[in-house]
Curated annotation (Swiss-Prot):
Listed GO biological process terms: defense response to virus
Gene: nucC
Note: Encoded in a type III-B CRISPR locus.
Site feature: Binds cAAA: R54, Y82, T226
GO molecular function annotations of the record: endonuclease activity; metal ion binding; nucleotide binding
EC identifiers of the protein: 3.1.-.-
Organism annotation: Vibrio metoecus
UniProt-recorded name of the protein: CRISPR-associated endodeoxyribonuclease NucC
UniProt-annotated catalytic positions: D74, E105, K107
Length: 245
């Protein structure tokens, strides 16, 4: 016998669950660092539960083959299927730049200060060097895959910029700017994303903002395709030379 379920109810429950967890974190933890960690964990858990298995979400630093590091990123969505290595050092996760699909700053509220902070974090990742090797196949090799555009965003519980035009004014930015935000969500009010078809930022107020945001993120990840084939030797050159016998 078919279950008496409704898709609308399932999607509503997903949004309500995330908003409830974020609200609980905000009310339960007074220490700002603990509160921040709790909110990050809510978003990381959401992504790891609902994104396809090829993706993994974690708090991390990002590194490139030229020994440059990003700032610490609250949520990094990266490729775990084709990534040849992920570093774990002193309880920190360090991910090669080639493996990154998206990076997010997590805050309690959506406002200009936090938008600027998110831009700075996103730019620190996009500025890193990424390699891309030719891809072997049965008939020869494919040309190196074009580098994907790393998605950058901001995730919050509340929106302090309730007037859409005000929020739009703070979000609008040159696409060439490495700190431009492609997407974001204020769980209690809205989500936003850059609409490539119309070449403009869209702010969408929504009762199920978290679920709507997740669907838009999935769409953007699909358009990214697969990360490039990483040049292992570019990283290996940083190995300390062996002492000659």
């Amino acid at each position: 016998m078919a279950q008496d379920w409704q898709l609308s109810e399932l999607l509503e429950n997903l949004h309500a669950d995330v908003q409830h967890k974020l609200t609980t974190v905000r009310k339960s933890f007074k220490h700002s660092v603990v509160k921040g960690d709790g909110a990050e964990n809510v978003w990381v858990d959401l992504f790891n539960q609902y994104l396809p298995e090829r993706y993994r979400a974690s708090r991390a630093f990002v590194v490139d083959s030229e020994n440059q590091f990003s700032e610490q990123i609250d949520v990094v969505i990266y490729d775990r299927q084709y990534s040849p290595f992920i570093f774990h050092y002193a309880e920190q996760l360090i991910i090669p730049a080639e493996s990154v699909y998206a990076v997010f700053e997590v805050k309690q509220t959506l406002n200009k200060q936090h938008i600027d902070a998110a831009r700075k974090k996103v730019a620190s990742v996009r500025a890193l060097h990424r390699t891309s090797l030719p891809i072997p196949h049965a008939g020869g090799v494919h040309s190196p895959r074009e580098l994907i555009g790393i998605i950058g965003g901001l995730l919050t519980l509340e929106n302090e910029l309730k007037i859409p035009d005000t929020l739009m004014g703070h979000l609008d930015h040159d696409k060439a700017d490495k700190g431009m935000l492609n997407i974001g969500c204020a769980a209690d009010d809205c989500f936003f994303y850059y609409d490539n078809d119309h070449q403009r930022m869209q702010v969408m107020q929504h009762k199920k903002a978290t679920t709507a945001f997740l669907f838009e993120l999935l769409s953007q990840l699909q358009k990214c395709g697969t990360v490039p084939m990483i040049d292992i030797h570019a990283y290996g050159k940083w190995l300390t030379p062996r002492i000659s016998e």
